């Protein structure tokens, strides 16, 4: 773990919210998202160095809305003013605060603190966790969702022209047969560098999820994310056992204990680790 070269005194905390319209709405099982409503936190040290943190309001992930996040941030702010940071362990101030849950808000504060610590020590942020980077870049995943198949194919072709190679096809709003046909049509016009996953966001019935899982590999899918309700762990384990591709948990991951349980019980083959649901990256580390 990185050792701070000097103590950092927090002088001020500024809080902002911003609603950002999306160019195109994203349709998932049970919800349509047409804007990003984000919380921004700016933490300023006595040296006037500052760190920025951000988190999206995500009611389906953390139960938080932007107005509630703003109020929670005002509450947390009082615990940081005049706080002296001496090590990364001082990030525990967020976990130890009286504020219950509000993990998205806490993750925005944590990123701002990490950004501030990195700047005060003149290093890139990743070096707080590791001395060397394992990779210099990662691909961006492009969503394919919520339109007619002809519109989705047009969007997919445009994304290919823009250089995207990794795609997540949103499924679960239709029956399995319809979504399998969608995936087949999209993957068929991709090239050999394309990678496709399917994400049901808990939208399938057990029967449709089973049918999709059995045939996913044949339509070009590499892994299948959150096929049914996360609470139906035994049924998800059954789907994982006979799925033609690896399965992935997402809505079922809200804590490190969830991560451990999913692995120990082989509920799914892997998981989507969103730090917003854990209260920040340090907890995941």
What are the functions of these language-model segments?
Residues 2-196, 201-203, 207-210, 214-218:
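N-terminal capping/lid subdomain adjacent to the active-site entrance of alpha/beta enzymes
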